[in-house]
Amino acid sequence: SDIYTLETVVPPQSPYAYVPNSATNLPLHASASGKLLIAHMSPKEQKKLIENSDLQALTQYTITKKEELWNCIKEITRQGYAVELSELSVGIGSIAVPIFDLRGTLRATISLVGSTEMLRSNLNRMVAELQRAGERITNKISYPNTTLHKFQ
């Protein structure tokens, strides 16, 4: 069970060198977008996926215990966004928020990748900005010919 990177955008003067290639596959259990996708699956789908997954360690910080992943998914469901810090690559982390269709079904995620230090120190601001971007994209695909609607 993997997640694929479709597009990446890097500021021209970015001091960070981590740039995943488009179409890079990442394991669901170790990426913010992957965990967000799991959180939006039905309970039956979640159970099947988690119980049948080999939670392989990519770094010393990767979640490798199913109970720990379940707890993480519950927290993501509660807060509405996902964060991973150093689970794919030490020193690099990501924040992901959902993009929904008109019926409220998760269709995609949008994520921000940066140094774990930068993400930790700016988490609340970055989550808020990413959520605004996710809401705008959701509104554009759900209501393409209308003005923006605020999530409730």
Where do the language-model regions lie?
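Cysteine/selenocysteine-centered motifs that mediate thiol-based redox chemistry or coordinate metal-sulfur cofactors
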Residues: 48-49, 54, 124, 134-152
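Amphipathic alpha-helical effector-binding/dimerization core
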Residues: 1-52
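Short loop->beta-strand "edge-of-pocket" segments that line small-molecule binding or catalytic clefts
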Residues: 38, 57-58
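Generic alpha-helical structural context detector
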Residues: 35-39, 74, 135, 139
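Sparse recognition of residues in long alpha-helices and their boundaries
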Residues: 22, 119-120, 146
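Intrinsically disordered, low-complexity polar/acidic regions
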Residues: 58-59, 90
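Extended hydrophobic
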Residues: 64-136, 151-152
